[in-house]
C-alpha cells in the first residue's frame, strides 16, 4: 500500500478531477474579500503603511511611465534610451535600482498594459493576482503528495495565506516571490520523479529574473531539498539525470541572467555585506530574545511588520519573520513529524530550523548579507503545508495531541504579560513586558481560536469524505478574518501620519506641471517619502535600498547616514548648493517649522497645489569647474560636519588622480580648509556659479552639458559615479574621474565644450548574450524532447 506523503504521478491539468483553477479562484476570491474593506475605505487608492506606501505605490507608478518613455526625453547623442532614472535618489541606473523591487517581475510587466495613472488603483488587483498565482503553483506542487486532490487544494490555501505571505503584503514585491516559487519546486519534482525536461530550466529563469536577491536563497533551499530527498532515496539518481538537471540549472541561470550580471557588479560595490571578522556573530545571535522570537514566529500568527507585541531587543521589525500556517499552526506538521521516520520532509524542515537559528547559515540565504532577515521562510512553509495535509489525510495520524501541545506553547507566552518588572528609576513594580498588549491579545486570540477550530473539525469531520473541503473552508474563513485584522493593525496604526498620503501624492502630480522649467534637483521638508518620484525630479529625500552604490559612500563621508534611505538634514545647508537643489517643497502646515529651522539661503517662491515652495538663493546649476583641489587623504582628515562646505570650495581627488589631474588645479592651502562658515559658503557658491555650464539637460540615458572654459580643467557633475557611464567630450570618448568619494568629473579643453554622459548598465552586453544564447539553446532543447516524445508515442 502506498504511503501518504510519498511522491506519485499527479493529475494532469485539464483532467476532470483536476482542481487547479478552483484553487486559483478560491485564493483570488479570498484575497479580494480581505482587501475589499480597505479598498472601499481608501476609494480605490489602497495605502497600507511604511514601505508599501513610500516605495511600492511610488515605484510601480513611476516605473510604468519610465518604461514607456514618459519621463525625461531621449538623448539626441545616442540610441541608448530608458537606462537612467533621475528621480531615483541623486540619479541611478534604472535596471540596478529596480531589479530588486520590480524590474524583472512578470506582474510588473503585466501592469504595463494599463495607463500610468491607473497604477495606484491597481495595487490591490495586482496583489489579488499574485495570491491567485501562488495558490495555483502550490497546488501543482502538492498534488503529487496526496491521494485525494482536495488535500492539495487545502495545502495550497495554507501556503498562500500563511503568516509569511500576509505579513509581506507590507513589502508587496516579496509576494511576487511567494507566488512564483512553487512552480520552481514543482518543476524540480517533475525532473526528479518523471524525467520531465525543460520546465525546470524555464522556472529557474523566471525566478532569477523576478528577483535575483531572493533567488540566492532559492538556490540554497533547492540544494537542501535535493540532498534531503536523495538521502531518503525518494528518487533514483543516475548520472544522466544528474547531468541533465545540472545542465538545466545552468541553462536557466543563463536565460535569467539579463538582470543578474549588472546586479552582481553593482552589489559588489555595496557595503551592506557581512563582516567576516564577526567571530561569535557567525554562530550566535547577540540577544536571547532573537531565539525566542524565531521560535514563536513558527507557531503564532505574525505581528504587524513595524510593531512588536513582545520583543524589546533583537532584530525583529521588518524581517518577515513568520512561518505560521493559518488555523493549523504547526499542529499538522508536528503530527506528521511524530508519525514518520526517515522522511525527507522532516529532514528539509529540520535543516531549515537549524539554518534559522545559526546567523551565518541564515545569512547564506542572502549571500551573507550582514543584516538579519527571515525572508526565506516561505520555502519551508510550502513543505510545512505538505506535511500538514499529509497528516490530515492519513487517518492513522494522531492530530489532537500536537494541537494541544502547540496551544500550550502559545499560552506559555502569557508569561511575558504577567512577569513582574521593577522600574530601575523609581523602584516601583509592574506586570508584563509586552510592547503592544492589544496586538498581542489579537495575535494570541487568533492563534488559540484557530487551533480550537482545527481540533473541532478534526474530531467531528475527520472520517467524513468532505473533511478536506470543510477544513479548506475553515482555513479560508480564518485567513480572511486574520488578514483583515493584521492589515488593519498596520494600516490604522500609522493613520495619524498616513491619512493624507493620497492627497499629497495626487497634489504632487499637479505641482509637477506648475514647477518652473529646468533640470535641477529639489528637496522636501516633512512631507511623505519619495514625492520626488511623483514630481519626476531628483530629490535629496529618497527611500529605497538599491540606489547607485556610490551614494552609499558619498553620504557617509559627509557624516550623513545612508542605509535604506537618503535624508540629509536641513542643517547641512552646503549640500543643497553642491547638489544643485533649486527648490524645496513643504506643506503650508509645516511652513513655520521650516522657516524657523532653515538658513538664510531660502526665499519663499509660491504656494500652489497644496504645497509651499521655496527657492534656494545659493543654487548652483549642475556642471561647474573649480580652482582648487584636495586629496582624499587630506579630505578624510577634516571634520565631517563641514565637509559639504569644503566641497563647494575644492574638488576632492584620490591620491592617484591628484598626480594626474592636479596640474589643472591649485592645491587648496591649509588655511582655506578651515574658513567654512555660511558667509564663505555663499561666496563659494557665487564662484562656482560663475564657472557653471550654460546648458545642462537631463535625459533618460544620462545628460548633456555645454560649458565654456578659460583653460583646460575638470568639469564636476554631482551625479553618482557608476561604471556604466561613458563620457564624451566634443564627440570623443573621455575618462571619467571619480571625485568627492562618489561623484563624477571629466577633463575638458579650453573653449566651448559639448559633454555627453551615456549610461548602460555595466555588464549588460554579457548578460544579453547569455540570455539570448540561453533562450536559443532552451528552445532547441525543448523541441528535441518534444520531438522524441512524439516519436516514442508513434512507436
What spans do the regions from the language model cover?
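Transmembrane alpha-helical segments
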Residues: 134-141, 180-192, 220-228, 330-336, ...
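Periplasmic/ER-lumenal interhelical loops and adjacent helix-loop junctions
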Residues: 53-57, 61-76, 106, 241-242, ...
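Soluble catalytic regions of membrane-associated enzymes that act on cell-envelope
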Residues: 113, 471-713, 717-725, 730-734
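Active-site lumenal/periplasmic loops and adjacent helix-entry segments of GT-C-fold
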Residues: 37-145, 150-182, 206-210, 293, ...
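Start-transfer (signal-anchor) and selected internal transmembrane alpha helices
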Residues: 1-40, 244, 452, 466-476, ...
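Active-site-proximal, structured, solvent-exposed surfaces of multi-pass membrane proteins
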Residues: 5, 10, 14-16, 665-795
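Contiguous transmembrane helix-bundle modules in multi-pass membrane proteins
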Residues: 194-195, 214, 345-504, 752-795
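Membrane-embedded helix bundles of polyisoprenyl
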Residues: 27, 131-144, 150-231, 244-264, ...
Amino acid at each position: 500500500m502506498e504511503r501518504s506523503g510519498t511522491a506519485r504521478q499527479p493529475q494532469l491539468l485539464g483532467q476532470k478531477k483536476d482542481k487547479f483553477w478552483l484553487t486559483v479562484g478560491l485564493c483570488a476570491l479570498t484575497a479580494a474579500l480581505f482587501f475589499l474593506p480597505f479598498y472601499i475605505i481608501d476609494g480605490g487608492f489602497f495605502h497600507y503603511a511604511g514601505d508599501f506606501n513610500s516605495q511600492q505605490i511610488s515605484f510601480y507608478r513611476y516605473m510604468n511611465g519610465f518604461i514607456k518613455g514618459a519621463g525625461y526625453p531621449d538623448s539626441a547623442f545616442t540610441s541608448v534610451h530608458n537606462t537612467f532614472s533621475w528621480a531615483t535618489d541623486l540619479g541611478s541606473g534604472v535596471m540596478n535600482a529596480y531589479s530588486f523591487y520590480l524590474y524583472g517581475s512578470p506582474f510588473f510587466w503585466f501592469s504595463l498594459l494599463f495607463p500610468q495613472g491607473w497604477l495606484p488603483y491597481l495595487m490591490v488587483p495586482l496583489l489579488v493576482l499574485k495570491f491567485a498565482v501562488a495558490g495555483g503553483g502550490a497546488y501543482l506542487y502538492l498534488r503529487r503528495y496526496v491521494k485525494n486532490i482536495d488535500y492539495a487544494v487545502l495545502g495550497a490555501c495554507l501556503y498562500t495565506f500563511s503568516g509569511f505571505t500576509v505579513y509581506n503584503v507590507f513589502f508587496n514585491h516579496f509576494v511576487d516571490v511567494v507566488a512564483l516559487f512553487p512552480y520552481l519546486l514543482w518543476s524540480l519534482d517533475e525532473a526528479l520523479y518523471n524525467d520531465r525536461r525543460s520546465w525546470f530550466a524555464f522556472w529557474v529563469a523566471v525566478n532569477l529574473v523576478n528577483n535575483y536577491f531572493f533567488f540566492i536563497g532559492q538556490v540554497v533551499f533547492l540544494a537542501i531539498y535535493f540532498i534531503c530527498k536523495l538521502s531518503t532515496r525518494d528518487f533514483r539518481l543516475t548520472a544522466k539525470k544528474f547531468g541533465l538537471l545540472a545542465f538545466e540549472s545552468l541553462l536557466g541561470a543563463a536565460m535569467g541572467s539579463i538582470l543578474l550580471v549588472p546586479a552582481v557588479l553593482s552589489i559588489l560595490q555595496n557595503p551592506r555585506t557581512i563582516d567576516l571578522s564577526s567571530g561569535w556573530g557567525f554562530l550566535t545571535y547577540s540577544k536571547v530574545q532573537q531565539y525566542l522570537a524565531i521560535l514563536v514566529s513558527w507557531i503564532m500568527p505574525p505581528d504587524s511588520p513595524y510593531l512588536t507585541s513582545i520583543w524589546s531587543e533583537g532584530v525583529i521589525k521588518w524581517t518577515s519573520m513568520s512561518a505560521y500556517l493559518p488555523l493549523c499552526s504547526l499542529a499538522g506538521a508536528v503530527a506528521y513529524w511524530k508519525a514518520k521516520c526517515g522522511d525527507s520532509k522532516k529532514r528539509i524542515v529540520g535543516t531549515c530550523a537549524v539554518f534559522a537559528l545559526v546567523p551565518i547559515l541564515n545569512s547564506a540565504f542572502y549571500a551573507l548579507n550582514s543584516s538579519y532577515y527571515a525572508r526565506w521562510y516561505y520555502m519551508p512553509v510550502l513543505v510545512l503545508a505538505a506535511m500538514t495535509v499529509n497528516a490530515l489525510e492519513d487517518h492513522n495520524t494522531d492530530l489532537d495531541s500536537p494541537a494541544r501541545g502547540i496551544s500550550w506553547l502559545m499560552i506559555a507566552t502569557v508569561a511575558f504579560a504577567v512577569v513582574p518588572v521593577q522600574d530601575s528609576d523609581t523602584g516601583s513594580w509592574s506586570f508584563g513586558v509586552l510592547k503592544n498588549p492589544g496586538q498581542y491579545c489579537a495575535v494570541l486570540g487568533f492563534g488559540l481560536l484557530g487551533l480550537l477550530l482545527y481540533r473541532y473539525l478534526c474530531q467531528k469531520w475527520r472520517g467524513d469524505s468532505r473533511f478536506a473541503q470543510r477544513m479548506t473552508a475553515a482555513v479560508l474563513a480564518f485567513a480572511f478574518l486574520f488578514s483583515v485584522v493584521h492589515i488593519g493593525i498596520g494600516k490604522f496604526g500609522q493613520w495619524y501620519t498616513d491619512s493624507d498620503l493620497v492627497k499629497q501624492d495626487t497634489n504632487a502630480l499637479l505641482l509637477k506641471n506648475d514647477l518652473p522649467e529646468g533640470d535641477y534637483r529639489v528637496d522636501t521638508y516633512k512631507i511623505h517619502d519619495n514625492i520626488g518620484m511623483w514630481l519626476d525630479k531628483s530629490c535629496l529625500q529618497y527611500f529605497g535600498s538599491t540606489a547607485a552604490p556610490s551614494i552609499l559612500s558619498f553620504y557617509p563621508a559627509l557624516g550623513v547616514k545612508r542605509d535604506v534611505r537618503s535624508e540629509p538634514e536641513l542643517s547641512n545647508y552646503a549640500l543643497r548648493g553642491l547638489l544643485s537643489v533649486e527648490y524645496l517643497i513643504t506643506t503650508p502646515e509645516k511652513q513655520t517649522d521650516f522657516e524657523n529651522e532653515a538658513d538664510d539661503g531660502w526665499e519663499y517662491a509660491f504656494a500652489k497645489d497644496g504645497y509651499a515652495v521655496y527657492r534656494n538663493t545659493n543654487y548652483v546649476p549642475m556642471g561647474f569647474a573649480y580652482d582648487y583641489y584636495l586629496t582624499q587623504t587630506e579630505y578624510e582628515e577634516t571634520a565631517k560636519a563641514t565637509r559639504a562646505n569644503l566641497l563647494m570650495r575644492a574638488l576632492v581627488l584620490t591620491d592617484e588622480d591628484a598626480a594626474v589631474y592636479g596640474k589643472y588645479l591649485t592645491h587648496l592651502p591649509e588655511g582655506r580648509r578651515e574658513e567654512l562658515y555660511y558667509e564663505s559658503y555663499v561666496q563659494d557658491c557665487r564662484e562656482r556659479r560663475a564657472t557653471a555650464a550654460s546648458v545642462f539637460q537631463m535625459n533618460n540615458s544620462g545628460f548633456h552639458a555645454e560649458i565654456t572654459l578659460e583653460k583646460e580643467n575638470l568639469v564636476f557633475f554631482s551625479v553618482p559615479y557608476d561604471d556604466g557611464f561613458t563620457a564624451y567630450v566634443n564627440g570623443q570618448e573621455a575618462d571619467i574621474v571619480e571625485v568627492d568619494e562618489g561623484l563624477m568629473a571629466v577633463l575638458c579643453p579650453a573653449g566651448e565644450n559639448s559633454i555627453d554622459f551615456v549610461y548602460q548598465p555595466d555588464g549588460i552586453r554579457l548578460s544579453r548574450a547569455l540570455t539570448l544564447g540561453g533562450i536559443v539553446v532552451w528552445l532547441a532543447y525543448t523541441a528535441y524532447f518534444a520531438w522524441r516524445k512524439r516519436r516514442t508515442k508513434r512507436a
